[in-house]
Amino acid sequence: MREVLKEEGFAPLPRRLDEERPDYPRPTVEPVADARAFSLEPRSFTTRCGGLFLFVPELVRLDLEKMAAALPGSKMIPAAHALRASLALKLWSIERKSHVMTLAADEGLALFAGLNAIPKKSYFSEYSSRFGHAQTTRLLAAWQEQLAGAGLLRGESFNLDFHSVPYYGESPQVERHDVSARSRRQASVLVFLAQDADGRAFCYSNADIRKGEEAGEIFRFIDFWKRTRGELPRHLVFDSRLTTYAKLAELDGLKIDFITLRRRSPQIMKDIVCLPRSAWRTVELDISTRKYRTPRVYEQTVRLHGHAFRQLYVQDLGHEDPTVLLTNQRRTSAKQLITRYAHRMLIENALSDAVRFFHMDALSSAVGLKVDFDMALLVVASGLYRLLAQRMRGYSDAQARHLFRDIIDIPADITIGGGEVRVQLHRRSHLPIILASGLMDQPFAVPWWNGLSLRLTARDALKPRQT
């Protein structure tokens, strides 16, 4: 319009004043996150993230403030507040840091962290840059220390695995690894994870791994466990790609029991084919849900790097090729060995849940050390979900995404006043399970709320209209 008037010789129209402009929604300016501006003045509001407050009793019991003591922080956002805010993103299944902007105005999310407002995407991106591997390891060690009395990590046996997080950028520092989901090698960040076999929770992670260091990562986990628990891991289960035969000999020298697979080389396949039928014996597995419960087994002793190991050929497990198990457990029956290795699928299921719910494959950076902190958050968040699952009747084996869908994803009305914070969960079909968990029986004092207590309640049923 300005150009048309100019061509016709007219002067430009004067700019309208703000009060002359039409009334339409304009961008709002949200406050900057600052713990010093955190207020617990009496007020009421509604939050989309009501289910997050179900984790608060566990965070109080596990003393998150102590866990965050050695982490980086500032006067505006102290270390404990930064850790709670970062955990909130994981617990609420926020895929990328930029997606937090959709919840920037949610007062409930800020209250959970103990801040006046939730930090913005730029803060979360910058915060992980302040972590080195030593600090991330200290966070995991503190998490282990706080979980010692929770019964979640028994430490009897561990499932170990690598996971390659795909990278689609152009950074030359990102190395190529096997990505099992795509059955090919591509640029990716390699992550090592350890899972407690009984508690089904991750207990260790490391994303600061370069090519050539993979075989020794199992010993870094052993050193970590010894430092935090004062003893060596008792039993490890992993696949054939995790380490080398030389490292297996070292494990045997440390008297650590293990079960692993051996790669089916042409010579091994030839030996299996040449075995007479009478050499095989049938065992029955005590797994009622398994289709193939009567595999055939042949056992022998092999020497690798000067150490004797038990080697089991296993057929009729539902695979076209036989399975080759290798172990240093000399007194355990073949049936127990096969059953225990079959339970290694628990870490595969946990990795699937981590990818689908905790968005493990949504790479936060091309820098492995930044990914390292993100994986440590995954370890803590998955542990909190396992602890909550133990409280919920019928959900002890549920994966995080199932628990989130049924239990956590609930809005709530929050009222601050009278010396407490009252979180009134909206009605949902699974609300009776929360009521039966005991979380609503009594209030919990929350340290980062200046001594105020959290009281979880359920919204009353709608009263019938009177006519």
Where are these regions (language model features)?
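An anionic, glycine-rich sequence signature occurring as long contiguous blocks
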Residues: 25-45, 249, 254-350, 354-356, ...
